[in-house]
């Protein structure tokens, strides 16, 4: 299984959301990349997939929406180990279920505090590391 990198990619078509989220993550010393569109996000992932450990992904974006980006990440052998948290204002059960079906590793509402965002990111990354350790032990 390929190892994932150390960067977090923030994808949102609202620059203020990107900047605020990036500021919160950088306060905790996370290395970030940013994108304002689905197209740009896919290009960044293609060019930097070995460096990216997590994508915070908005669902509602013009042209290529977050679901399409998620599907392309999870269906590509090179990228599928990258963790994806859908980060959106959409709070309908349908959206949560669709995200899970497409392989999302988590779901966050944008009306979240910086502390709650950081706590959730830490939890997702910690859970993933524990899963990796279990997998390594099973292979021994």
Describe the predicted segments one by one.
Residues 34-54:
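Acidic, metal-coordinating helix/loop segments flanking the phosphotransfer/catalytic sites
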Residues 105:
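Short, glycine/charged-rich "phosphate-handling" switch motifs in NTP-dependent
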Residues 61:
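Receiver (REC) domain active-site loop signature in two-component systems and cognate sites
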């Amino acid at each position: 299984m390929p190892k994932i990198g150390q960067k977090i990619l923030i994808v949102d078509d609202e620059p203020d959301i990107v900047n605020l989220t990036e500021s919160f993550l950088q306060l905790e010393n996370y290395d970030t990349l940013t994108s304002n569109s689905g197209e740009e996000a896919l290009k960044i992932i293609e060019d930097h997939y070995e460096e990216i450990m997590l994508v915070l992904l908005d669902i509602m974006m013009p042209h290529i929406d977050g679901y399409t980006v998620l599907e392309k990440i999870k269906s590509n052998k090179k990228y599928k180990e990258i963790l994806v948290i859908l980060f959106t204002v959409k709070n309908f059960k349908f959206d949560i279920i669709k995200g899970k079906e497409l392989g999302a590793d988590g779901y966050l509402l944008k009306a979240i505090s910086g502390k709650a965002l950081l706590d959730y990111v830490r939890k997702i990354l910690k859970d993933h590391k524990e899963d990796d350790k279990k997998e390594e032990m099973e292979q021994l």
